[in-house]
């Protein structure tokens, strides 16, 4: 269950298919919690990643496994929001969470490997405006924190704006 009493807190959001959830996801969550003093990290499991052609394993099994590997990480909450928000898009999830946790800061978490296609995401520009900070991690290199202004500059360069 995602905690509803997180007023004036910092909440990280890590979305994906989690097929399967693995130590890298846990590592991203722990590093973001430590670096940003997050109260909670929400793993938002999607039924189907719009950028992946393959059919993922059963949602129930993926969710159960994600919860199992986090049994000792009480700050990580695992949930599929698609039935609630009627969308599998990150922009819609962030809008929902910003409304639900009005007085909290939302921190968007993602692997740096997703940055290359970020400009293809529906509502990517809105996501950059709604989230104060992003946490990007490259799994095989040093962890890096990237503030939103720097990220906007990267996106502008990619799009030649």
What are these regions (language model features)?
Residues 1-161:
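Nucleotidyltransferase catalytic core that binds NTPs
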